[in-house]
């Protein structure tokens, strides 16, 4: 509703303003000076709410208290936002069973925390000629994570690496 660089009291340059009282009642069109006097008598501030209106709309309110309330609301909104991190699990085309299970456990732990997981395979030397081996490893990995994750991007090559993106399943599904 009101921006951070809000015009208050003497900062308002319009000659006439439509005045709204502190209870939300319309006080009519007043000169800027008269509106400032009314706000001053109530020990409150005159705040420009709608600058583009004809005439501009001003409201009588305690600006300090209003800013405090706005900051509190913004802080609460930021606190409720879930930050999703991207975790990477590196595999190799010739990964052993125990190593695969360890990487899988870590990936499942990340997914249960709500993070996305990027499973990547780096091909070294001539291993790049056998991309199907890496493809099978990533397919096996995505099938093993199927209970807690959905595949966001299918396995694809990027230079000498092949990667797969997994996102946590929603509770709704």
From Swiss-Prot:
Organism, scientific name: Bacillus subtilis (strain 168)
Pfam family of the protein (one): IF3_C
Gene Ontology MF terms in the entry: ribosome binding; translation initiation factor activity
Subunit organization: Monomer.
Main location: cytoplasm
Entry-linked HAMAP family: IF_3
Places the protein is found: Cytoplasm
Name of the protein described by the UniProt record: Translation initiation factor IF-3
Family membership: Belongs to the IF-3 family.
SUPFAM superfamilies the record matches: Translation initiation factor IF3, C-terminal domain (SSF55200), Translation initiation factor IF3, N-terminal domain (SSF54364)
Entry GO terms, CC: cytosol
Function description: IF-3 binds to the 30S ribosomal subunit and shifts the equilibrium between 70S ribosomes and their 50S and 30S subunits in favor of the free subunits, thus enhancing the availability of 30S subunits on which protein synthesis initiation begins.
């Amino acid at each position: 509703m009101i921006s951070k660089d809000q015009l208050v009291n003497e900062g308002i340059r319009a000659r006439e303003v439509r005045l709204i009282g502190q209870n939300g009642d319309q006080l009519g069109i007043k000169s800027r000076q008269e509106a400032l006097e009314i706000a001053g008598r109530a020990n409150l501030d005159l705040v420009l709410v709608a600058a583009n209106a004809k005439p501009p709309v001003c409201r009588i309110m305690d600006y300090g208290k209003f800013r405090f309330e706005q900051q509190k609301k913004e802080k609460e909104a930021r606190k409720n936002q879930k930050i999703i991190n991207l975790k990477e699990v590196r595999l190799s085309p010739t990964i052993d069973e125990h190593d695969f299970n360890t990487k899988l456990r870590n990936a499942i732990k990340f997914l249960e925390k709500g993070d996305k997981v990027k499973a990547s395979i780096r091909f070294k030397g001539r291993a790049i000629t056998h991309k199907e081996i890496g493809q099978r490893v990533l397919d096996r990995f995505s099938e093993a994570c199927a209970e807690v994750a959905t595949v966001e991007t299918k396995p694809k090559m990027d230079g000498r690496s092949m990667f797969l993106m997994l996102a946590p399943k929603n509770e709704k599904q």
